[in-house]
């Protein structure tokens, strides 16, 4: 079978080693004669899987002991509702930083529960899209919390600053950048991430929440979104997505075996440098994000002649480079190069790009 590299933004590529283990264990897990998908989430065997996955996740991000880790349903969009329902309390507003598509989506959902103070952080620097430094964000004094998205998958924009807002409760959607670089978890009240990019398959959402923020949910908050209920029940208030949880655990083990988050950080920088280098050294390709705010996870790029887009996608697919079509909102191309994408995959893409330019430029 020819080598295929999947550049999908999510559900995304999983590590080959993880898929191999899952395949080997699929029909007979740990000698039980059944699949891990078939055993009770309350069995001692699955409890062991769940506890080990949480511990490995804590180790990878060095999560302080005063934070709870929740394995949830609902995806990132579910957390758009969970945040105000759990954190608003008796306040009526929260600060929402708009840096792109997903941050704006969080604002739209939040309006069902509060009146957001929207901070438009989008700016232009030398004709390229960028984000205001955090020091220029105008937070309000009466906000229940501040929310932002550190990495915008569609726009290819990253916010790399570490938040330092005093006593403000900082919440963040880390869906597309979790585990790709070190995070100072202590700077946040809530971190959440859909699993389908850097953690595992779709269907699982991880939430890291500071313990002092528990117990404040609105009376109308659905139990499946209530952080306290989930914490008190070890994320098993209802049946969790057990297979996704198991696979996430395999990914965490793979990360630890391969040097952890620090090693991923270095490799991800190498991959991004290689791809952006080809784009920047060409008049055939372009990226319209300022260097300081370029995403290392999602690299959108345009061809100078858009009439070649269809051919580029056809030829790249035939070459084993899949899912390079850009999001419908921005068009063009997009290469998502999460942790599971090896450097060899990015090298294969850049070699193809150089050759395509030679033939059609």
Swiss-Prot record:
The entry sums up its family as follows: Belongs to the class-V pyridoxal-phosphate-dependent aminotransferase family. SerC subfamily.
Q: In which pathway does it act?
A: Amino-acid biosynthesis; L-serine biosynthesis; L-serine from 3-phospho-D-glycerate: step 2/3; Cofactor biosynthesis; pyridoxine 5'-phosphate biosynthesis; pyridoxine 5'-phosphate from D-erythrose 4-phosphate: step 3/5
Catalytic reaction equation(s):
O-phospho-L-serine + 2-oxoglutarate = 3-phosphooxypyruvate + L-glutamate; 4-(phosphooxy)-L-threonine + 2-oxoglutarate = (R)-3-hydroxy-2-oxo-4-phosphooxybutanoate + L-glutamate
Positions carrying N6-(pyridoxal phosphate)lysine are 197
GO terms of biological process kind: L-serine biosynthetic process; pyridoxine biosynthetic process
Which Pfam family is an annotated match for this chain, by its short name?
Aminotran_5
This chain's protein is named: Phosphoserine aminotransferase
Q: Which domain of life is it from?
A: Bacteria
Q: Which InterPro entries match?
A: Aminotrans_V_dom (IPR000192), Aminotrans_V_PyrdxlP_BS (IPR020578), Pser_aminoTfrase (IPR022278), PyrdxlP-dep_Trfase (IPR015424), PyrdxlP-dep_Trfase_major (IPR015421), PyrdxlP-dep_Trfase_small (IPR015422)
Top EC class, one word: transferase
Keywords, A to Z, come to: Amino-acid biosynthesis, Aminotransferase, Cytoplasm, Pyridoxal phosphate, Pyridoxine biosynthesis, Serine biosynthesis, Transferase
Which cofactors does it use? pyridoxal 5'-phosphate
Supply the EC number(s): 2.6.1.52
Q: How does it assemble?
A: Homodimer.
Residues where pyridoxal 5'-phosphate binds: 76-77, 102, 153, 173, 196, 238-239
* HAMAP family linked: SerC_aminotrans_5 (MF_00160)
Residues binding L-glutamate, per UniProt: 9, 42
Give me the comment on cofactor binding.
Binds 1 pyridoxal phosphate per subunit.
Q: Which CDD domains match?
A: PSAT_like (cd00611)
Role according to the record:
Catalyzes the reversible conversion of 3-phosphohydroxypyruvate to phosphoserine and of 3-hydroxy-2-oxo-4-phosphonooxybutanoate to phosphohydroxythreonine.
Q: Extract one GO molecular function annotation from the record.
A: O-phospho-L-serine:2-oxoglutarate aminotransferase activity
Give the chief site where it resides.
cytoplasm
Provide the species name. Cronobacter sakazakii (strain ATCC BAA-894) (Enterobacter sakazakii)
Compartment(s) of residence? Cytoplasm
Note the SS bond partners.
none
């Amino acid at each position: 079978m020819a080598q295929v590299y999947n550049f999908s933004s999510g559900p995304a590529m999983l590590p080959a080693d993880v898929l191999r283990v899952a395949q080997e264990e699929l029909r007979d897990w740990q000698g039980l004669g059944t699949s891990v998908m078939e055993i009770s989430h309350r069995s001692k065997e699955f409890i062991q899987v769940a506890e080990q996955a949480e511990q490995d996740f804590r180790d990878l991000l060095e999560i302080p002991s005063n934070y709870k880790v929740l394995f949830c349903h609902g995806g990132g969009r579910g957390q758009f509702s969970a945040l105000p329902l759990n954190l608003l309390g008796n306040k009526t507003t929260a600060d929402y930083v708009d840096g792109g598509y997903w941050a704006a989506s969080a604002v739209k959902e939040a309006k069902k529960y509060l009146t957001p103070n929207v901070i438009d952080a989008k700016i232009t620097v030398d004709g390229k899209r960028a984000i205001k430094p955090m020091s220029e964000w105008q937070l309000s004094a009466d906000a229940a919390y501040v929310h932002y998205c550190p990495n915008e998958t569609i726009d290819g924009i990253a916010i790399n600053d570490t938040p330092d807002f005093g006593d403000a409760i900082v919440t963040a959607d880390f869906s597309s950048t979790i585990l790709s670089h070190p995070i100072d978890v202590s700077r946040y009240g809530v971190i959440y991430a859909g699993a389908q990019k850097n953690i595992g398959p779709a269907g699982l959402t991880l939430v890291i929440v500071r313990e002092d923020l528990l117990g404040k949910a609105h009376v109308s908050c659905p139990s499946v979104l209530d952080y306290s209920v989930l914490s008190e029940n070890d994320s098993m208030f209802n049946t969790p997505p057990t297979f996704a949880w198991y696979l996430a655990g395999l990914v965490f083990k793979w990360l630890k075996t391969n040097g952890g988050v620090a090693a991923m950080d270095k490799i991800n920088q190498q991959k991004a440098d290689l791809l952006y280098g080809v784009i920047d050294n060409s008049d055939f390709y372009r990226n319209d994000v300022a260097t300081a705010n370029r995403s290392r996870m999602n690299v959108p790029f345009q061809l100078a002649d858009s009439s070649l887009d269809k051919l580029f996608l056809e030829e790249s697919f035939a070459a084993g480079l899949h899912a390079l079509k850009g999001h419908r909102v921005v068009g063009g191309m997009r290469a998502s190069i999460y942790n599971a994408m090896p450097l060899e995959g990015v090298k294969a893409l850049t070699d193809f790009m150089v050759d395509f330019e030679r033939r059609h430029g």
